[in-house]
Amino acid sequence: MGELISSLEVFRKDYIEMPNLPTREEKDGSWISSQLMRAGFVGGEVKRLHLDSKYWVCTKKDFQNWIEWDWTNGKRYISEEYDCDNFAFSFKARCDRKIGINAVGLVIDYSGGHAYNLVVFSDVAPELFEPQNDSWKKKGQSSMFTLTSGYVIL
């Protein structure tokens, strides 16, 4: 019986109790726009599609704690069925639903032929995020992250 209780405690901690986000802050759409422009993620042939007028952001450290808890990256990749765009949509939706952070964008990168996320933080510049393997990416790091043509939906 003790082993079952221990296993349930681990399950509760790992899958039910989400990390606390003590740094959640409200920002307006113009602040988000300036962050994206300053970081070079929008402009030219990369357009932003606005979703909200108010956004909630957190520190990168708190967001990293969320990523360690989230299991989107554990999904199985199935070409043309559950692929890059599905991972990116799912991760964005989970951030909205589970932790109330809506400053996670969906990037449709036509130049790279890929879809992924972009996260705006309260304490550091926005960064690109690959939800398939929980990794941070730099613009231009590889041919999949060129972001010279496409959309940032945020």
Task: Give residue spans per PLM region.
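A structural boundary/capping signal
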Residues: M1-L154
